[in-house]
Regions:
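N-terminal "leader" segments that precede or initiate the main folded domain
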Residues: 1-7
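N-terminal ordered "arm"
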Residues: 7-66, 73-74, 79
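An acidic- and aromatic-residue-enriched active-site/binding cleft used to recognize and process polar
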Residues: 62-66, 89, 110
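Short, surface-exposed linear segments at secondary-structure transitions and domain or protein termini
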Residues: 65-71, 112-116
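Catalytic cores of nucleic-acid endonucleases
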Residues: 70-99
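Domain-level recognition of nuclease-like catalytic cores that cleave nucleotide substrates
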Residues: 95-116
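Conserved small/polar residues in nucleotide/adenosyl-binding loops
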Residues: 118-122
Length: 122
């Protein structure tokens, strides 16, 4: 599922209007960033407006937001540059190493994409 979320994010396969963080901040995606195939955040140099303010930084994607803790990102300064955490299940709030909260956006798999993936995987 996490790889599917990467695909959905990279190709903007989600409604581009009325996106909001889990805390109600309005989200406008300007640029999803460059996919990272190495260690570190999943996408570099994304451009996102949160409540009209432009943020440029990295994006991390997990199936569940609690994976942030499981992967140790809360203690890894490499992830302090994350400006938006993408998840399909926001089961916890996530924070930088200094305790500052990171905005989270819930993305779900559009039906037509999920059906296609189910057929592909078999």
């Amino acid at each position: 599922m996490e790889q599917l979320l990467h695909y959905i994010w990279k190709h903007k396969i989600f409604p581009l209007q009325e996106l909001k963080t889990t805390t109600g901040q309005k989200v406008e995606i300007i640029d999803t960033g460059l996919a990272n195939t190495n260690a570190g955040p999943d996408f570099f140099n994304a451009k996102v407006k949160l409540n009209g303010i432009l943020w440029i930084g990295n994006v991390e994607i997990h199936e569940r937001s609690s994976d942030w803790l499981k992967h140790g990102h809360h203690t890894d300064a490499t992830y302090d540059s994350v400006i938006l955490h993408i998840t399909s299940d926001a089961d916890i709030d996530v924070h930088r190493t200094n305790g500052e909260p990171i905005p989270q956006l819930i993305l779900t798999c559009p039906d037509y994409v999920c059906r296609s993936e189910e057929r592909r995987v078999g």
